[in-house]
């Protein structure tokens, strides 16, 4: 429920079933926006005050690079569990498997400047903006030695 004028954007991707369910559930609420597949995820992320996402590698890393406070939801066992532990241990995100706690965590990140700044500082410390170029350089070196 939006109480303070905020808007909630839910991006469902290719999950048409969940998109249909959410559209039915929130059709009356003009502050809840249900989006299916979009090529504009980055733009929606730029507008975020906080992001709720499962701890997949792509969205989690992009959120870190964009310095968006992250609330991780329940992971899919395996790689996402490892991502959840990695991000949590470094204070790059907060998490809970329980919806009510996730809401509390997100509100705290929005309302508590100190908490948000602590996560932001950790994200700036851990991100590696030159990683892609370093990988390309390494690959070039490996290819030139063959």
Model-derived segments and spans:
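Conserved beta-strand positions in the Rossmann-like core of class I SAM-dependent methyltransferases
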Residues: 9, 71, 94
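A donor-sugar binding/catalytic signature common to diverse glycosyltransferases
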Residues: 41-82
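Active-site-proximal loop->helix
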Residues: 82-89
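C-terminal "capping" alpha-helix adjacent to the active site of nucleotide-linked donor transferases
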Residues: 89-94, 98-114
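A short, well-ordered alpha-helix in the C-terminal region of glycosyltransferases
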Residues: 115-129
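C-terminal alpha-helical cap of glycosyltransferases
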Residues: 128-146
């Amino acid at each position: 429920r939006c109480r303070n004028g905020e808007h909630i954007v839910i991006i469902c991707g290719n999950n048409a079933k969940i998109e249909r369910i959410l559209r039915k559930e929130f059709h009356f609420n003009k502050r809840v926006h249900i989006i299916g597949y979009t090529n504009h995820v980055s733009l929606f992320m730029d507008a975020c005050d906080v992001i709720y996402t499962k701890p997949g590698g792509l969205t989690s890393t992009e959120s870190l690079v964009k310095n968006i406070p992250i609330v991780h939801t329940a992971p899919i066992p395996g790689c996402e569990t490892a991502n959840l532990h990695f991000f949590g241990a470094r204070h790059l995100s907060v998490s809970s498997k329980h919806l009510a706690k996730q809401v509390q965590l997100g509100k705290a990140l929005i309302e508590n400047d100190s908490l948000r700044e602590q996560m932001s500082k950790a994200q700036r410390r851990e991100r590696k903006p030159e990683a892609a170029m370093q990988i390309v350089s390494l690959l070039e070196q490996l290819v030139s030695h063959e």
